[in-house]
Amino acid sequence: VKWAWDHMIQALSLQWQFDISNNSWGAIDPFSDNFNSTSLTFGWVALRKGVEDGRDGLGTSFVFSAGNSAGSGDNTNYHNFQNAREVITVGAANADGTMAGFSTPGANVLVSTYGVGLITTDRHQPGLGTQPSSDYENNFTGTSAAAPLVSGIVAMMLEANPNLGYRDVQKILAYSTTHPDGQDWKENGASDWNLGGLQFNDKAGFGL
């Protein structure tokens, strides 16, 4: 496990050189990715370097999948990579816009998007993998599938306005959402110019 974390941290430490860093991975056990542990302290350092030095000071946008362990009672609050303020944590929704039952909830889920039955390329060469007769997969499912969609949206945002900071990106995503059905929403107070707050849900974040 330490070997895996060491290599993951090493990869993260280089992400400040990129505009967007998609991270479709996460720890399974609660608190196993604690930044206070010696081996993971540099994980937070890598995130800070990304938002402080990435994109010439505007900040790298780190996108993380929320996790697929809602059924076991997991919560993104238990995972430092998902609950770090430097990241965009993404939940998964079904094709009909309702939230996927497996999507891990938490107070730090920013937004959600489709993450069930997506079409993508197969991971293996022809003749191998889960789709041996095809180069495509039509059942890419999980918050790991949802996160890259948000990363793509962020890429289009930065193409339209290269001067956006990483916090601008987070705020625009939150303000651009709609509310999926079947969720209870809480009012989230704000100190904006019009004192207007948003509605939030632990499963969907600010919305879809």
Residue ranges of predicted features:
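Subtilisin-like peptidase catalytic core
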Residues: V1-F42, A46-E52, G91-N94, N139, ...
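Surface-exposed intrinsically disordered loops and tails
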Residues: D6, S13, D29-T41, R55, ...
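Predominant activation on well-ordered alpha-helical scaffold segments within soluble catalytic domains
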Residues: L14, W44, R48, A147, ...
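C-terminal subdomain of the subtilisin-like protease fold in secreted/lumenal serine endopeptidases
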Residues: F18-N22, G59-T60, E86-T89, G101, ...
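Catalytic metal-binding/acid-base residues of hydrolase active sites
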Residues: G26-I28, G67-G71, A93-D96, G117
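Catalytic-core regions built around general acid/base machinery
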Residues: F35-S61, N77-E86
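Extracellular S/T/G-rich loop segment that most often corresponds to the catalytic His/Ser-adjacent loop
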Residues: H79-E159, N163, D202-L208
